[in-house]
């Protein structure tokens, strides 16, 4: 009898403590009325509005959230619009025939309107660590969230988001913006601030470190000291992230129009090494090697092209970034094996790309294009006969020419600069003039051929048959 009374009292006390903790943890909400913010429905995607109106009509809450709200408040055009609701993914799917559920780690509903996808997420809740939660919530030994499908309230959802500036909620029901974490103030002050304990949040998802840097570069903001402090010592946690996810993140970092500024921040916070270990081995103390100069220049050029609404290709970016590690590797293989430089170059391409893909799962369609651009570099100097015309017809000639021009610029090499000038004139000349340019090449004295020593037999490489 005494035991039963004691258990009853223990349950009552624990319930009261839990309710008290929740009351303390419950954030104070700031409601910003329509006349005090700049968001207008005319700036929101019609499809996002349709999704929110239908959810509201069905009796659910629906809020615009995340980067879309942030960008609208900053007067920028959002790239996409995300919606959050108290409806579960299955309930969302019942409301929209054009909906599919995606994700195991984070269960989401994608409502598709042709090429536009409106992402709908259910309010996330806190992790209590109950046994019954293991099917919906799971952590790795290092604290990383392997599964996060515990649903909760909008107040809990605000606390579960990454940065304060991304935790602002806009309602089409009353046109207000709700702020539970001080996001409006940080937005005005230009501060990137993580919600909650930074080290815990980074361990939950190490990609948040990359996102902090990306937002700082993209928005021209500064990272708050408490948010920045753990990043350098936790940077190696990125090694636990699947390479496919890191590849997608690398494109967001370097091909979104702010690649050069992002690159500088990645290096400052020691985040570049987990993404590109092959490249960081060749960094110099003064940062003025040809490799470092070509990375800076290709990122600046990429940013300019994006801001001018011109196309960019990751294959060209990777071809430029990995060019000098490729040359070093090819030279080393040639010296150690006695292979011709052409054969050593081919093996070096495999080695460099294999190592790159261990960190970033670069798709084969891109590595194939990167190889083409590299191989054409060896052919650009051989222009006699029909070679120049054949090279001009290659689908990757223009990309190869652009890399040649970049090399000439960063190496300050007079011979490369003359070659760039020749190809620049040749590709825009009329056929008769092109023939004249080739005839002039034939009249130039050919370099004296050196007598070659007999080639050593190449040792058998590991892993080859």
UniProtKB/Swiss-Prot annotation:
Its main location: cytoplasm. One of its GO terms (biological process) is mRNA processing. The keyword Chloroplast does not apply. It catalyses: RNA(n) + ATP = RNA(n)-3'-adenine ribonucleotide + diphosphate. It is an enzyme of class 2 (transferase). InterPro entries: NT_sf, PolA_pol_head_dom, PolA_pol_I, PolyA_pol_arg_C_dom, PolyA_RNA-bd, tRNA_ntf/polyA_polymerase_I. Its EC number is 2.7.7.19. Pfam families: PolyA_pol (PF01743), PolyA_pol_arg_C (PF12626), PolyA_pol_RNAbd (PF12627). Belongs to the tRNA nucleotidyltransferase/poly(A) polymerase family. Monomer. Interacts with CsdA, RhlE and SrmB. This is Poly(A) polymerase I. It comes from Escherichia coli (strain K12).
């Amino acid at each position: 009898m005494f035991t039963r009374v004691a258990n009853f009292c223990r349950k009552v006390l624990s319930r009261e403590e839990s309710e008290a903790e929740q009351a303390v943890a419950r954030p104070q909400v700031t409601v910003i009325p329509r006349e005090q913010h700049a968001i207008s429905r005319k700036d929101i995607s019609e499809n996002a509005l349709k999704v929110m109106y239908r959810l509201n009509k069905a009796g659910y809450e629906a809020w615009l959230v995340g980067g879309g709200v942030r960008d609208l408040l900053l007067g920028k055009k959002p790239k996409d619009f995300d919606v959050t609701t108290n409806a579960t993914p299955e309930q969302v799917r019942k409301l929209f025939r054009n909906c599919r559920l995606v994700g195991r780690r984070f269960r989401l509903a994608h409502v598709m309107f042709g090429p536009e996808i409106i992402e709908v997420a259910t309010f996330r809740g806190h992790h209590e660590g109950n046994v019954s939660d293991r099917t919906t919530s799971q952590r790795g030994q290092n604290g990383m969230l392997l599964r996060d499908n515990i649903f909760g309230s909008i107040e809990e959802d605000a606390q579960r988001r990454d940065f304060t500036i991304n935790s602002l909620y806009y309602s089409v029901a009353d046109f207000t913006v709700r702020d539970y974490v001080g996001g409006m103030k940080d937005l005005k002050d230009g501060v990137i601030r993580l919600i909650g304990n930074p080290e815990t949040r980074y361990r939950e998802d190490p990609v948040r470190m990359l996102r902090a840097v990306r937002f700082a570069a993209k928005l021209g903001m500064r990272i708050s000291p408490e948010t920045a402090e753990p990043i350098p010592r936790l940077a190696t946690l990125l090694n636990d992230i699947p390479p496919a996810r890191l590849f997608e993140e690398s494109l967001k970092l370097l091909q979104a129009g702010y690649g050069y500024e992002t690159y500088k921040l990645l290096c400052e916070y020691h985040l570049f090494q987990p993404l590109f270990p092959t490249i960081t081995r060749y960094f110099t103390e003064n940062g003025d090697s040809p490799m470092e100069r070509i990375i800076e220049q290709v990122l600046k050029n990429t940013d300019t092209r994006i801001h001018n609404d011109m196309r960019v290709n990751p294959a060209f970016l990777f071809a430029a970034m990995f060019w000098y590690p490729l040359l070093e590797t090819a030279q080393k293989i040639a010296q150690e094996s006695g292979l011709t430089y052409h054969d050593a170059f081919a093996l070096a391409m495999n080695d460099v790309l294999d190592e790159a893909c261990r960190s970033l799962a670069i798709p084969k369609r891109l590595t194939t294009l990167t190889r083409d651009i590299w191989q054409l570099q060896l052919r650009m100097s051989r222009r006699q006969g029909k070679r120049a015309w054949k090279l001009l017809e290659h689908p990757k000639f223009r990309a190869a020419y652009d890399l040649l021009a970049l090399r000439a610029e960063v190496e300050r090499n007079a011979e490369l600069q003359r070659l760039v000038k020749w190809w620049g004139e040749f590709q825009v000349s009329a056929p008769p003039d092109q023939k004249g340019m080739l005839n002039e090449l034939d009249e130039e004295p050919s370099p004296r051929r050196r007598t070659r020593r007999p080639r050593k037999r190449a040792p058998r490489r590991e892993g080859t048959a």
